[in-house]
Amino acid sequence: MDIQWKKQITKSFSLTGFSIKADAMKCIINRIKNEGYDITQLIDNLLKNLDKSQYLQTIEGCFKLIDTINSSDAIEKEALKVIDAFNTPLFNFDSNSKQFIKSENFDRSLHGSSNSKSDLYRKRYLKVLQRTERNDYFSTPVLASDKLKNEYQTITPLSSLLGNTGRKHVLGTISQIEEDQFYIEDLNTNVKIDISKAKFEFGIVTINSIIQASGEFIDGVFIADKIQLPPTEERCETLKFLQNIDMFGERPQKKTMEQLIKYEKEKEDNSILFLSDVWLDSERVMERLDYLFGGYKDCPPFAMILMGNFTEHPLINGTQYQLKKYFNQLAMVIQKYPNIHQFTQFIFVPGPTDPTGSLLNILPKFPISNVFIKDFISLIPKSTFTTNPCRIRYCSQEIIIFRDDLTNKMRRHCILEPSQSCDISQHLIELICSNSHLCNLTLEDKPIYWNYDHAMSVYPLPDLLVIGDKSNQYEHSRADGTYSMNPSSFSTDYSFAHYIPANKQFYYNKADRPSDEIEDDDDDEEVENQNENENENENENENENENENNDNDKTQQKDTQGDGDDNDDDEIMIDENEKQKSRKRNKKVVIITKEDELNKLEDDEEILNSLDVQQQSENHADNNNNNINNNNNDDDNEDDEDSNYNNIESEVQEVEKEEEEDEEPIDNDKLDEFIE
């Protein structure tokens, strides 16, 4: 049976111009045996799905393509692909054939040779040069007339400037070989350049930027009168020139791409969230994440891309292992929402200070070390930890993500101030797109692994460029077909970006502030408690005033009883008077104590007055007791005793009047102010 199958397979492939090797033959026969395929139908499917643009293709790839087309789950898995920086394909431009050629066996070591450093700059320059020469402004027609030729310009090599008079256009990398002197370099030489009088309008120019300068070469110095960044190229034009070369990585085959485009249009509700600066060690940030997940629990996003830094402060000196605890806390929050846990793909991009196995902040940055995230991955299987920068392919769209504070860096190192007519973010994006590089600062300012500089390339331009920056949110839609955006810092204002790939629309949102609402409620409770305390104090004061009035009424009633009252009533009357005076003294002391915060001198005088009144009252009370004892011993002196008693009462009343006159009226506003 196997021999008959082999003959039939060999004959079918040879009729279509293909030859099949022994290992491919074995793979097909195993499929027929194990899965019961009809051999004729299987061969037809294989031949239909062979990519004719490639001369060599594996049978395993064809089977994978067939399974992908026939399975909706496989399409969903193929919809999102993450390409880390160290798996980015390398293509070198061949100046002779004017094509990009893939380099299969390039040096992948982190510590490149000296040639790697020089090749780094050459590759950057050639990539921009070939694109600029194809620009309409520099593409002179072959059979053009002299008049028509004057409408076009050419890029003059720097080595041809000597003895070549007139206004010229040059393209080169600006550098500073000598202090206070700028140079412009190309592949062969460098010349001094004077930019003091140059007109510059759009973009940012830093040391190491590739610029296009116009001017004259005089006495060994190129006097530039105009400087601009190289022209960009529309994405569709670049793809047409590349002739289906996959410089991005993980590009699916034609049949799969058709299915992915169909899937992309059908899934209109699929969304991708972008968050930057997600501090997992901050309680308030975790609260906002919890609140954010709660808002998407019924309609989970297709993917969530979380960019570092993942801690507020760098974890150094042995504290790196705390990151494991923080990711476990995040896993617990995600597990609270089953839909998000089941359907959302989480992608983590490290920030500048995150521990990634290297103490040096060199680009590309490695993923977060597995020792910190292995528990998280076991709890959240649909999670991917990738490099910084990284590339993401969603169906037919290519996305580049880079987490760095580029705005501040470029401002510090710019040598030509950008115009104020546009936002600084527009100048930054123009620099990135025109130089086809994410960060073209000097290697001293921003070190890069020499052998992996191609991972920082932005050529061809992606559909979406995401820069995770601490600056304010921005989004720019460019004429060349690239959409750029910055979700801003989630830890600062809890802002994030909501992207819908089906219609390429962005929505900027902010996580609500539940803790602030709680704080507002707490503030309201405190205000209510203060009001209640004020009301209680007012009620106490009213009760005290009522007690005073009642005591005064009782005293007046007892004063009117006259001589007919017996000695026991006299003692009760005197005791009531003493209690009344004591209450007044205590009340007065309390008021003085509160007023002491406002005016200490007046309080001291009032306290002394109150003490004098207290002493006088005690003396009157002693005299009163002595008179009562004398009345008990001598009943004959009853009239004298009554007169003495009346005299005592009159004296007490006079003292009370003096106290009331001396006592300042209570300022209720000040008292309420003091209580508050």
From Swiss-Prot:
One Pfam family linked to the record:
DNA_pol_E_B
Keyword flag Transcription: no
MF-aspect GO terms: DNA binding
Q: Where is this region: Disordered?
A: 513-676
Q: Where, per UniProt, does this protein localize? A: Nucleus
Q: Residue spans with biased composition (Acidic residues)?
A: 517-550, 562-575, 633-643, 651-666
Gene Ontology CC annotations of this record: epsilon DNA polymerase complex
Keyword terms, alphabetized: DNA replication, DNA-binding, Nucleus
Biased amino acid composition, Low complexity: 622-632
Q: Where is the composition biased (Basic and acidic residues)?
A: 551-561, 667-676
Name the domain of life: Eukaryota
Q: Name one GO biological process term.
A: error-prone translesion synthesis
Its family remark reads: Belongs to the DNA polymerase epsilon subunit B family.
Record PANTHER family: DNA POLYMERASE EPSILON SUBUNIT 2 (PTHR12708:SF0), DNA POLYMERASE EPSILON SUBUNIT B (PTHR12708)
State the protein's purpose: Accessory component of the DNA polymerase epsilon complex. Participates in DNA repair and in chromosomal DNA replication.
Assembly and partners are described as: Consists of three subunits: pole, pole2 and pole3.
Quote the protein name from its UniProt record. DNA polymerase epsilon subunit 2
Gene name as annotated: pole2
